[in-house]
């Protein structure tokens, strides 16, 4: 049993549609892209902007200026990778989509022709490959473990690899072109060959006690969160405090597993 307003029940009933789509990412995705494009547009000439009305001559002043320049350069590289990520999430849901690389002031300005999934995947591959030099290998490598969750080189590689894998799948590759599978395999090999990843020894503690170099071996892209039990409470049965029966397996999923008649 589940509440009638929950997303899973909407899917079960077939009551979702263009006016209620629990996975409606279109507006949010393009808003994110537009925000990134605005940042990239504003960041042009960032070195000169950072030098305005500040000391860049003394040793200490020059050091602080160079630190700020490095930080902005990282932000720019991360922004390009995130723009690729947003395009992937949109294409994953909607297939052919417009590729937007300039800030738009209104919806009419964003009405561009859709481009095929292959074209989007190629854009993602080029967008991520072009900023690898500006991304850190990991945040612990640069003594900034608290920044875990921001984009790294392997995050960018993973975005590219997944886009190429989807492009090779039967949905977007009905002719089963082997070149697309090879491109996806090579993209994943870039991650594997870094030899940075392995399973962490204690899965439970992976989510506790902060970030460490050892834990990062299992994590390509971390999601930051604050400790709490709201997710578990939402899984409680209806009738308990805060319960929403959040876990709603379908009947087909139930039948796919062994069960015993009581």
Where is each model-derived feature located?
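Short, solvent-exposed turn/loop segments enriched in Gly/Ser/Thr/Pro and often Arg
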Residues: 1, 98, 139, 148-151
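An aromatic- and glycine-enriched ligand-binding surface/loop that stacks and positions planar moieties
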Residues: 1-7, 132, 150-262
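Conserved, well-structured interaction surfaces
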Residues: 2-94, 109-111, 115-122, 128-143
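Extracellular structured ligand-interaction cores
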Residues: 35, 74-76, 81, 96, ...
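Structural recognition of the beta-strand scaffold that forms the well-ordered cores
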Residues: 38-40, 87-92, 98-100, 123, ...
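A glycine-rich, coil/turn loop motif that links secondary-structure elements
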Residues: 70-77, 142-155, 204-206
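Short coil/turn linking the two alpha-helices of tandem helical-hairpin repeats
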Residues: 89-93, 98, 139, 166-175
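Short edge-strand/loop segments of extracellular domains
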Residues: 103-107, 189-190
């Amino acid at each position: 049993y589940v509440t009638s307003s929950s997303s899973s029940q909407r899917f079960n009933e077939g009551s979702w549609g263009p006016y209620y789509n629990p996975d409606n990412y279109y507006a949010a995705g393009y808003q994110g892209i537009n925000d990134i494009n605005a940042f990239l547009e504003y960041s042009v000439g960032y070195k000169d902007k950072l030098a305005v009305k500040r000391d860049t001559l003394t040793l200490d002043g020059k050091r602080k200026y160079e630190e700020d320049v490095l930080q902005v350069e990282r932000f720019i590289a991360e922004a390009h990778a995130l723009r690729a990520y947003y395009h992937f999430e949109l294409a994953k849901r909607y297939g052919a989509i417009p590729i937007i690389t300039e800030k738009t002031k209104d919806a009419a300005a964003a009405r561009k022709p859709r481009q095929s999934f292959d074209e989007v995947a190629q854009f993602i591959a080029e967008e991520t490959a072009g900023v690898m030099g500006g991304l850190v290998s990991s945040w612990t490598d640069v003594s900034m473990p608290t920044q875990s969750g921001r984009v790294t080189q392997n995050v960018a590689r993973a975005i590219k690899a997944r886009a190429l894998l989807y492009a090779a799948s039967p949905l977007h590759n009905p002719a089963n072109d082997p070149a697309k599978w090879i491109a996806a395999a090579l993209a994943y090999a870039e991650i594997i060959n870094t030899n940075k990843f392995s399973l962490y020894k204690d899965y439970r503690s992976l989510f506790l006690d902060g970030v460490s170099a050892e834990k990062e071996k299992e994590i390509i892209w971390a999601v930051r969160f604050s400790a709490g039990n709201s997710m578990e409470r939402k899984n409680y049965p209806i009738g308990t405090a805060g319960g929403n029966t959040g876990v709603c397996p379908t009947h087909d999923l139930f039948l796919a597993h062994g069960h015993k008649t009581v």
